[in-house]
Amino acid sequence: MRITVFSDTHTRHNLITNDLPGGDLLLCAGDIMNSGYNKDDIISFCEWFSNVKGYNDKFFIAGNHCRYFENYPEEVKGILKEYPLIDYLQDEEVVLYFDGPNGEHTEDNIHIYGSPWQPEFYSWAFNLPKNGIELAGKWEAIPDNTDILITHGPAFGTLDTVIGRPWDGLGCELLADRIEIVKPKIHVCGHIHSGYGYEFKNGTHFFNASVLDERYEYTQKPMTFDWDKETNEITFL
């Protein structure tokens, strides 16, 4: 399975089009907006995302800059109905089924879960008190059989530091604890732009897929890789 991951385009999604080679899955880990107040930013992203060529399935979540998603969820649902080729996940699971030779569903399916929340971060969207009961509840909702987890923020201690402060992890401790239990094969996040990169530990492939750097310049490319679910091995393109 060929997967491309990206995050934090902040309305500059058109910049990355030529770095999307096509494949099975295209995953976005949030912050498609900038101020978060302009619904035209949502429409612009959805138009673009829908028209990206060469992918079988496309999923995205919101992030802390996506205030409109949190403040006007019903209006956002109405917007998203106009774009049936893409799927938005907010504390939701989707299962990709693969058919056998006679059209029957096989056991070779993939469970994907997406959630936009993070520990309180200034006055942005999808904030919950750090290490609080509500945030713990969001992560407890991640199904135990999740293969691919998409969250906006990173887990504590993994791809979560800012330039000049490598000792000061900004990721979520409760999310890290839940990942240790669920052990998803892939975790995709963004949020901390300078945390961009890849790590593999304890059986999970971690991707911080932020494409804009700290100056909001496009210097960090989407990551595309081939993934074998059975062996959990990946090969970067």
Predicted segments with their positions:
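Short hydrophobic/charged patches on amphipathic alpha-helices used for structural packing
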Residues: 15-17, 140, 176
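Catalytic metal-binding/acid-base residues of hydrolase active sites
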Residues: 10, 32-33, 64-67, 93, ...
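Core catalytic region of metal-dependent phosphoesterases/phosphodiesterases
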Residues: 6, 11-102, 181
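Binuclear metal-dependent phosphoesterase catalytic core
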Residues: 94-101, 106, 177-182, 186, ...
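Short, electropositive alpha-helical surface patch
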Residues: 76-86, 169-171, 200-213
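Active-site-proximal beta-strand elements of phosphoester/diester hydrolases
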Residues: 1-10, 29, 108-118, 147-152, ...
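Binuclear metal-dependent hydrolase catalytic cores centered on His/Asp/Glu-rich metal-binding motifs
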Residues: 107-148, 166-173
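Active-site-proximal segments of metal-dependent phosphoesterases and phosphodiesterases across multiple
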Residues: 33, 38-41, 47, 121, ...
